[in-house]
């Protein structure tokens, strides 16, 4: 099993080019199921989850081609297999995103209940409830969702909770439904907007993108298009926190500043000097960080996917920070590993109290999920001595060449 070996204590400095957003690319790849024409997707990151999704789509009959420039062509002229098996779904929760488009286009789907990161139940009941409202017949047997419908019908759907993948699944399904679908309490995340913009480019009729009420007028068919995936706001935030925690200076290229207000506000509150343009961000940390309180919530509030990284920043900050996690119930699993590195953290329910210490100590630590693995890498970068991060397959699910990008900033990090 691969691991990362890090010699800490280096001030990071330099330029980083941000990759395409995994959480936008995955549903956009699934959108290829909605048309028999070719969908060309640019800026697709090279990640394990992307590879798994492409393998799954190929198994369903989608022809794919990936070139050296991270451009992916997908043609779903004929869907030969309407099953997403457990063996492929268990490592990636996003595989549930084939359910809506496959059902809308082919009239049937059999999808395994999802796996992925162990950071909460993340139930799919909102997906099922919405599709049933659109006329689908759904049964769950032996760990699989069995769905069928001659043609989906438009419906008024009020989601009980804000769910990103639920919004995406229902939005894709509604593009080919008969009539108008209204999604209330819809997710507003930029990745949802990116998918919607791709669907619109394919001929979908969607209004309210970026609001909590999305209206989709179904059409008979969608067509192919060229689309470029948005930059990854979580990768952007991770590198900004890495630079801030190390007292460094960083310049992000090919990013999207307008998607990062909550993260940038907290970094400035911590003492970072930040300048930015439409597609670039410059951060410089002149003084030790100040502690910042966080409360995760759906976009545009502070993202849960940045909670663990900011916890690392708070471990060495001046003062005490209170971090409240409202999205997932098990997203403090990295705390135990940070405590092995001399962090002072107390957890009670969905709240963590982080008291800043003079410095972290290198240690052997183990990643438990994608963002926790990133936080442990950041901790190793600022710790005294050597840190070994095990189970980094989690990291490879969401960060493209992270050790290469960090090395270019001066980090002493290698894969073993």
UniProtKB/Swiss-Prot annotation:
Cross-referenced Gene3D superfamilies: Enolpyruvate transferase domain (3.65.10.10)
Record keyword Transferase present: yes
GO terms (BP aspect): cell division; cell wall organization; peptidoglycan biosynthetic process; regulation of cell shape; UDP-N-acetylgalactosamine biosynthetic process
Residues that bind phosphoenolpyruvate: 22-23
InterPro entries registered for this protein in UniProt: Enolpyruvate_Tfrase_dom, Enolpyruvate_Tfrase_sf, MurA_subfamily, RNA3'P_cycl/enolpyr_Trfase_a/b, UDP_GlcNAc_COvinyl_MurA
2-(S-cysteinyl)pyruvic acid O-phosphothioketal sites (modified residues): 117
GO molecular function: UDP-N-acetylglucosamine 1-carboxyvinyltransferase activity
Gene Ontology cellular-component terms listed: cytoplasm
Residues of the active site: 117 (proton donor)
Pathway the protein takes part in: Cell wall biogenesis; peptidoglycan biosynthesis
Enzyme class, first EC level, given as a word: transferase
Function: Cell wall formation. Adds enolpyruvyl to UDP-N-acetylglucosamine.
Name of the featured protein: UDP-N-acetylglucosamine 1-carboxyvinyltransferase
Gene name linked to the record: murA
């Amino acid at each position: 099993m691969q691991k990362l070996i890090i010699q800490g204590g280096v001030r990071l400095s330099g330029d980083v080019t941000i990759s395409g957003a995994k959480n936008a690319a995955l549903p956009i790849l699934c959108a290829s199921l909605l048309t028999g024409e070719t969908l060309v997707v640019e800026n697709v990151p090279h990640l394990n989850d992307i590879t798994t999704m492409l393998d799954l789509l190929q198994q369903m009959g989608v022809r794919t081609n990936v070139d050296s420039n991270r451009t992916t062509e997908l043609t779903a002229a004929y869907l030969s297999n309407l099953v997403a098996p457990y063996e492929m779904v268990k490592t990636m929760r996003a595989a549930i995103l084939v359910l809506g488009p496959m059902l809308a286009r082919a009239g049937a789907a059999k999808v395994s209940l999802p796996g992925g990161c162990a950071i909460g139940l993340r139930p799919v009941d909102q997906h099922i409830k919405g599709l049933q409202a659109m006329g689908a017949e759904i049964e769950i047997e032996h760990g699989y969702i069995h769905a069928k419908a001659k043609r989906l019908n438009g419906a008024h759907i009020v989601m009980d909770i804000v769910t990103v993948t639920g919004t995406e699944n229902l939005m894709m399904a509604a593009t080919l439904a008969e009539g108008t679908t209204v999604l209330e309490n819809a997710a507003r995340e930029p990745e949802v907007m990116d998918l919607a913009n791709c669907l619109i480019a394919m001929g979908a009729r969607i209004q309210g993108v970026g609001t909590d009420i999305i209206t989709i007028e179904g059409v008979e068919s969608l067509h192919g298009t060229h689309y470029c995936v948005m930059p990854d706001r979580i990768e952007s935030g991770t590198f900004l926190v890495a630079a801030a925690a190390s007292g460094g200076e960083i310049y992000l290229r090919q990013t999207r500043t307008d998607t990062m207000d909550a993260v940038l506000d907290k970094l400035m509150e911590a003492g970072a000097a930040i300048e930015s343009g439409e597609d670039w961000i410059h951060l410089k940390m002149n003084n030790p960080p100040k502690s910042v309180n966080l409360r995760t919530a759906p976009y545009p509030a502070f993202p849960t996917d940045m909670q663990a990284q900011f916890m690392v920043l708070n471990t060495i900050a001046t003062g005490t920070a209170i971090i409240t996690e409202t999205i997932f119930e098990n997203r403090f699993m990295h705390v135990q590993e940070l405590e092995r590195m001399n962090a002072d953290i107390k957890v009670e329910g969905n709240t963590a109290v982080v008291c800043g210490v003079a410095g972290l100590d290198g240690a052997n630590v183990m990643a438990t999920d994608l963002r926790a693995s990133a936080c442990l890498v950041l901790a190793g970068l600022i710790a005294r001595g050597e840190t070994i991060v095990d189970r980094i397959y989690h990291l490879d699910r969401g960060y493209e060449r992270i050790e290469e990008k960090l090395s270019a900033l001066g980090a002493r990090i290698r894969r073993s």
